[in-house]
Regions:
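Kelch-like beta-propeller repeat domains
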Residues: 1-210
Length: 210
């Protein structure tokens, strides 16, 4: 079933009832204008149809990280697109949001650091959402690009019951713009960028610890 609009650089997740959520991104070529639109479709019945939900209150963004907690949909970070000196630049975000069906959006605790394009849907395990690497914007515009040292490897853990964050070590090969696929009690992290524009053939498995 086609989305109501074209979208790139968005994020999505599947909840416990097999509802597919897609949030934010861009409907235009290049990084020119971001979206705050959110869509959901139930694939547990026939025929599935997309429904538009209230926009993300934090505003338009590209490359956020999404997750599902039971029947709820969560969105973390991403990058807003803003004009500056005749160009469009990224503003790296730390806000976090939860959508509860029938109740709407609520704001969660801000991330300890900005997080853009971390593995998504984010791993959910051990009562937590895990953000593994991604881009925090600290090296945006680094020159020369070939000497870019890579993305931060900090692993962020959002404790669902407490509503709080902690930093829990570093990923051995931090990357951005890649999926996280549940498998064998862990989450497979295939490919992704090790620095802007440079992709990796590496495949790792991330196993969250209690």
């Amino acid at each position: 079933v086609d989305l109501p609009v074209p979208l790139a650089l968005a994020a999505g997740a599947v909840d416990a009832a097999q509802n597919v959520y897609v949030a934010c991104g861009s409907s235009e070529p290049g990084e020119q204008k971001a979206s705050a639109r959110v869509f959901v479709a139930g694939f547990h019945g026939s025929p599935p149809r997309w429904k538009e939900l209230p926009e993300l209150p934090g505003g338009p963004r590209i490359l956020p990280v999404a997750a599902a907690d039971g029947g709820d949909f969560l969105v973390f970070g991403g990058a807003a697109l803003e004009p500056k000196d005749g160009k469009v630049v990224r503003r790296y975000l730390r806000d976090a949001w939860r959508y509860r069906p029938g109740k709407g959006w609520e704001r969660l605790a801000d991330l300890p650091r900005p997080c853009v394009a971390a593995p998504s849907p984010a791993p959910v395990a051990a009562g937590s959402v895990w953000l593994v690497g991604g881009d925090d914007g600290s090296l945006a515009g680094f020159q020369p690009p070939a000497a870019h040292p890579g993305f931060p490897g900090t692993v962020l853990r959002y404790h669902l019951a407490e509503g709080s964050w902690s930093e829990v070590g570093r990923a051995p090969q931090p990357r951005a713009t890649l999926p996280a696929v549940p498998w064998d009690g862990g989450f497979v992290l295939p490919s992704g960028e090790v620095r802007p524009g440079v992709r990796s053939p590496a495949v790792q498995i991330f196993r969250p610890q209690p």
